Design a protein with these regions (language model features):
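Conserved hydrophobic/aromatic "anchor" residues
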Residues: 9, 22-23, 50, 76
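Structural micro-motif
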Residues: 59, 65-74
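Non-catalytic, surface beta->alpha helical segment in thiol-disulfide oxidoreductase systems
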Residues: 75-102
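Conserved redox-active cysteine motifs that mediate thiol-disulfide chemistry
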Residues: 22-36
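Short active-site neighborhood of thiol/selenol oxidoreductases, capturing the structured segment around
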Residues: 13-23
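N-terminal "domain-start" segment that seeds a small globular fold
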Residues: 1-11
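Thiol-based oxidoreductase modules, predominantly thioredoxin-like and allied folds used
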Residues: 3-4, 22, 37-41, 45-60
Length: 102
């Protein structure tokens, strides 16, 4: 799992399809989503790149992406945001979100 931050954002977004999980360690729903995102990143590793961004590590960078609440998964295609999923969702719904964006 890649770490997404201001230092490597351009490099990561050069991939065709990228899913970034914006999270924080103190966020209960984020901690619940973490293992689901990890499992799905392994399942769909051939189709997309998966990364995580701890919003506490760089709040300004998170705000640049319009992150107002977490967890939030953003899908980027060719460097442009195309979709986002906000809040905790069950694995089936996160998987549908991924499938419709790859």
């Amino acid at each position: 799992m890649l770490v997404y931050n201001k230092d490597n954002a351009k490099e990561i977004l050069e991939n065709k399809v990228v899913f970034v999980d914006f999270w924080a360690p103190w966020c209960g729903p984020c901690r619940a989503l973490g293992p689901i995102f990890e499992d799905l990143s392994e399942k769909y590793s051939e189709s997309a790149v998966f990364a995580k961004c701890n919003v506490d590590d760089d709040e300004r960078f998170a705000r640049k992406h319009g992150i107002a609440s977490i967890p939030c998964i953003i899908c980027f295609v060719n460097g442009e945001e195309t979709d986002r999923s906000l809040g905790f969702l069950p694995q089936e719904e996160i998987e549908l979100f991924i499938q419709r964006n790859i």
